[in-house]
Amino acid sequence: MKFKLLTINPGSTSTKIAVFENEKEILSETLRHSSKELEAYKNIYEQFEFRKDTILKVLKDKNFNIQNIDAVVGRGGLLKPIVGGTYKVNEKMLKDLKAGVQGEHASNLGGIIANSIAEAFGVSAYIVDPVVVDEMEDIARFSGIPELPRKSIFHALNQKAVAKRYAKESERDYEDLNIIVAHMGGGVSVGAHKNGKIIDVNNALDGEGAFSPERSGNLPSGDLVRLCFSGKYTEDEILKKITGKGGFVAYHGTNNALDVQNAALEGDYDAKMTYNAMGYQVAKDIGSAAAVLDGKVDCIILTGGIAYNKLMTDFIAKKVSFIAPITIYPGEDEMLALAEGTLRVLSGQEEAKKYK
């Protein structure tokens, strides 16, 4: 049976939309929003009608008959911690997305816009594996300071999608596998997947774990505290150093990993050291995840935009291939991942979860 799905992925300055017929993409557009357009709105939620109307106008301009859709799926936002899966949008979810219970982010609009369009055409709206997916074991939450428990905020959508892709290609069930997934993009997350649950992962949103093109990664605690109280920086400036101006940005003034790689290949010693240091830290986190899984690892997956860079994947593979075979799925196809999650529900493979 064929299903037509509208997928919606709101970002800070753009909204990506795509239409799928099962897993085949038949329409894709990135709708850019100028800062001038967005300045008219006091907060993220106020952009809702503007973004929705823009989506409907583009679909009309493309002569797509939206009445033919079977479901609408939006990118999941900063909700309360939930287990992974596909969730049907309900009133409780809409309330929490509007309130920004874990912070304001453009992705909070995904479920809201999806629900509004779905209601107008008499179909259901869903979200799939938002960044707040939390399946961590209790032992993984300890940090060493009770007031600072470790949190699970990471690239859940792509982590789950590539792990399930590997399972499908291996003709095995995701729930029967132990997989380590290293997502490397603007941020880095390394997740230990055990029998269908991500039982330990770094908080990529706050820059925990390996450093990345724009995030600092783990820092020397004492030195960080002294920096905070040096009088040189405000709280916002310190937070920016950790997420936004850390990593490659701090060392080389760019968040483009390819620029750093090319400089390294051209003989720039500092660029080579920084580039390798990121790979070193990712490999170290993969080793830690292997310990979490008691050394029983079926596969290590390298994914995200930086997984296109052979210099990086080769460096990491050399260090961790003794643990398990390496599979590389470069990039992240978020729109397809949203569609696949919804298809699993519509086809009866999975049951939609209820947000509470």
From Swiss-Prot:
Keywords: ATP-binding, Cytoplasm, Kinase, Nucleotide-binding, Transferase. It is found in: Cytoplasm. It catalyses: butanoate + ATP = butanoyl phosphate + ADP. Its EC number is 2.7.2.7. GO terms for biological process: acetate metabolic process; butyrate metabolic process. Pathway: Lipid metabolism; butanoate metabolism. It is an enzyme of class 2 (transferase). InterPro entries: Aliphatic_acid_kin_short-chain, Aliphatic_acid_kinase_CS, ATPase_NBD, Butyrate_kin. Homodimer. Catalyzes the conversion of butyryl-CoA through butyryl phosphate to butyrate. Belongs to the acetokinase family. This is Butyrate kinase 2. It comes from Clostridium acetobutylicum (strain ATCC 824 / DSM 792 / JCM 1419 / IAM 19013 / LMG 5710 / NBRC 13948 / NRRL B-527 / VKM B-1787 / 2291 / W). The gene is buk2.
